[in-house]
Amino acid sequence: LFQMDNYTDTIMLFEAAAMGEQNPLTAMMTATAYNVDNFETMASDLAVYCERTIPLSTGAQKAVQLVPFSYARYWHGYLIWLRPLLCVMSITGVRVVQYLVLFALLAVILWQLRRQCGLRAMVWFAVSQLAVTVFWVPHQVQYFTTFCIAYAGCAWVLARPRRAGQLSIALVVLGTCTAFCDLLVTPIITLGLPVAVWLCCLPQRAASGARQCLPVIGGSLCWGAGYAMCWGLKWVLATLITGRSEEH
């Protein structure tokens, strides 16, 4: 994560600030927001978007014509928690909350790894997260969303020994949650991290190569099925409810 995904975060913030006269169901399906051409002017663009006016040098206000854009192919599940938080705090406060949540989950995972898999597994997991600069993840809403889902999956896997069938069911849920919340930026992390920590557990380490590979392949297919079904369902519902088959 050596580059901040400000463009995607800008889209998320504009979706959170979206205003319109559509009924809630149609608004959820269309996910209409203001079209952003330059994420570097996000602060001023958000002010214009919310006020729908531009201040003039004379002190008067000039009405602006907003250009709508629909992100109808995504569920935008992150709005379930982002909108309420933005009602009571600024984006800086949201980032503080994200830091607290993510590093609390990381602490739980490291403790579970130490207990279930040993000190070496815990250290290498911590090193891997530092290698991807996890300390910057909560600074971005987009990265936080997928890392939070992935860490929650890791915590569930490590809570007690899990059979391959249980892992596959969990990966269906993780794939569905990822499609519901993610904007197709870092989805695969919600598959890779839970599977990696599952393989670190003692029963899997003692298994033969085939007994390790087959659950991973099957679990990956389950994750993909959950992701595809959730994402495809949004396309179908958005088309049926809005009468449009593409974003605009």
Where are these predicted regions, by residue range?
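Interfacial juxtamembrane loops and adjacent helix segments
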Residues: F2-Y71
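Juxtamembrane segments of multi-pass membrane glycosylation machinery
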Residues: R73, I80-Q98
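Membrane-interface micro-motifs in multi-pass membrane enzymes
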Residues: W75, V127-Q166, F180-P187
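Perimembrane helix-loop-helix junctions
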Residues: G153-L158, I189-L221
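Membrane-interface alpha helices of multi-pass inner-membrane proteins
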Residues: L167-P194, P215-C230
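Transmembrane-lumen/periplasm boundary regions of multi-pass, lipid-linked membrane glycan transferases
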Residues: A225-R244
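Conserved small/polar residues in nucleotide/adenosyl-binding loops
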Residues: H248
